């Protein structure tokens, strides 16, 4: 409490404790009111240290006053307390809160009057001085005279042309540097351009065309010119080739004035637009965002080319709403379409911020892998559905289903599992088995049963021969074919190949 109550001390504290809360009341301000005010300021997110000075109290009053009409009684009490504290800091003698509020209102009214009188005094002082803002200025005698364009302005214009090389931003720069200039000043700016003579020749052709159009729309009136009246400017006069500087100043400052400088400036800007279009051959339709290009760089390129487009503002707005989204890369296009057609440039750049960066690439890769995983799982589930019912296994040892012989708990079957006889295993079983042709396999003759037979199979065992050196002459192949045709089963398999 001591730190909060240290706002006032000495004579100020005595003056504080003499002020009454209400007119004619008994209660007066105490230190507890300062402690309460400090806590309330903290609750309203205001710095309690501002109570230590008169300027701080004035700042707090300025913050609280707009909310008095809709505020609570606590806010009104806080405002009254700080108003009394301000009077104590300023050593303004007040007896109660109401008188302190009246003093505050008087001070605020005086400040408003000073604020209103300051612009009027500034305007009066400005009018008393001679205008030096434009090439045509007013001298001390009240006459309008021409002030030559400064070398600094010419140097700035030359640097812009050399650095930008007739990019779209050259036009607004020329318009700013030539504000209020006469045709003679504009010609001086054009003559300082050393290079780009092809562009300068295009500009001259445009000026000549506009001058001829001016002469066609503003024919010369027949008859002599009345005394005291100036002649009407021709197209060549506006271009500064057949008019003097005095005539140009007189036209621009006459009553009614003829703004020959603004007309000539408009012709030059028209020619500069053609030059900019020639130096910027890229169409707005060709501006597309690269796959890894940040959206901010793409927007910069888009609007740089859009400035060079010779179209109305409505058409440019349509290009911005349509082409900017259409020519973005797929990632940004998806985000921009989700925003809708009414999104501003700020919302677009905020939404596409970070697209193409490492974090965005990682997120896209994770989403793609998740989709592939889900698709693979779905395919596996679909394939599993076509396998039909699961086949049950059967044990070859006990003959029961649900397990195999390796896991069978029944005692091992003795003997051969093929023929059932004991004394040998299935791999050593000599039991014969018929093949798909009905022949016994394995064959005792050493040849498989489906092998084409080249000789007659004997139907009886051969007679015993005790002779030595006897040769058995095989019968000719043709005779074998005539005696016994190929097996029916082989013919059915191989056709006429045998």
From Swiss-Prot:
Q: Where is this site: Cleavage?
A: 134-135, 365-366, 380-381, 435-436, 451-452
Instruction: Supply the SMART domains for this chain.
Output: ZnF_C2HC (SM00343)
Provide a Gene Ontology MF annotation, just one: structural molecule activity
From the record, which residues define motif PTAP/PSAP motif?
A: 458-461
At the top level of its lineage, which domain of life is listed? Viruses
What ranges does the record give for the region Dimerization/Multimerization of capsid protein p24, renumbered to this chain?
279-365
Motif Nuclear export signal in this chain: 16-22
Q: Does the keyword Transcription apply?
A: no
The similarity comment for this entry is: Belongs to the primate lentivirus group gag polyprotein family.
**Domain comment quoted from the record:** Late-budding domains (L domains) are short sequence motifs essential for viral particle budding. They recruit proteins of the host ESCRT machinery (Endosomal Sorting Complex Required for Transport) or ESCRT-associated proteins. p6-gag contains two L domains: a PTAP/PSAP motif, which interacts with the UEV domain of TSG101 and a LYPX(n)L motif which interacts with PDCD6IP/AIP1.
User: What name does this protein carry?
Assistant: Gag polyprotein
